[in-house]
Amino acid sequence: MNSENTQIVAALYKFVKLPDFAQKRDPLLSYCQAQGVKGTILLAQEGINGTIAGSRQAIDSVLWFLRSDPRLADLEYKESYTETPPFERMKVRLKSEIVTLGLPEIDPTEKVGTYVSPQEWNDLICDPEVTVIDTRNDYEVNIGTFQGAENPQTGSFREFPDYVVHNLDPTKHKKVALFCTGGIRCEKASSFMLAQGFAEVYHLKGGILKYLEEVPAQESLWQGECFVFDERVAVSHGLEEGSYELCFCCGYPISEEDKISPKYEQGISCAYCFDSLTEEKRARQQEKWRHYQTQVANSKNRDVS
């Protein structure tokens, strides 16, 4: 994509001690807004995590601003492209964790698993002695995952430690390979598993996004699409925009095939939320959808005038 409308989408994170993280919020927000960058950045004592979008010059400027702090000088990011702005505004939030596991004693800056490059990943997960685990939430796994990977069926990352405790055994699962969207969840997951006594814990460096960017489709062991937390909903090989969209009612990712279901009604319900909708909830949702359509129509009229 090289058109003037192309947006650079930059996903970034780094675990690093930032005791002054609260003081960084306002200057960072002001700088991002001045560059016209939109998205969300989380700041916590344990580091930084976020996804932002903007022009090439704007993204480069924000990265320069972040890296001007010596603690973030080696901040890495993953880049993809879109013609449609994926965010509506810029937010910088202060959090207790940049990815919520709920175990503050787990510190990836002190102990973390072994990084595996996208080019080496296929060989690792094809090893019959390796247990491959998708650390993402169930709704993410359902639209795409690696061949042979286990799905912990978690509703949030906070549930991952319980999954490990009740389903895995350090004496039986001697080699474990973890993966997630961009790598951040695996940092904490691998740190936690090492603390639980697992001897060999590997994780995909750069996450699924880096794998889809660097590994040719014909060599890939990835099946489906990768859920992303912005307006694109999902991406495929080469980080091309995928085919999913979010149900307006429940926010679950739905495919074109899902829309064939008799339980799907645009703006009202999908197969994943239909059975939970009472008549009262359905009426509220219909009103919400009508209000949304009016907002969209008014916005288009303003753009034309």
From Swiss-Prot:
This is tRNA uridine(34) hydroxylase. It comes from the Bacteria. The active site is at C180 (cysteine persulfide intermediate). Catalyzes oxygen-dependent 5-hydroxyuridine (ho5U) modification at position 34 in tRNAs. SMART domains: RHOD. The keyword tRNA processing applies. GO terms for biological process: tRNA modification. GO terms for molecular function: oxidoreductase activity, acting on paired donors, with incorporation or reduction of molecular oxygen. Residues 126-220 form the Rhodanese domain. Belongs to the TrhO family. It catalyses: uridine(34) in tRNA + AH2 + O2 = 5-hydroxyuridine(34) in tRNA + A + H2O. InterPro entries: Rhodanese-like_dom (IPR001763), Rhodanese-like_dom_sf (IPR036873), TrhO (IPR020936), TRHO_N (IPR040503). It holds the Pfam family UPF0176_N. Keywords: Oxidoreductase, tRNA processing. PROSITE patterns: RHODANESE_3. The keyword Oxidoreductase applies. SUPFAM superfamilies: Rhodanese/Cell cycle control phosphatase. NCBIfam families: PRK00142.1-4. Its EC number is 1.14.-.-.
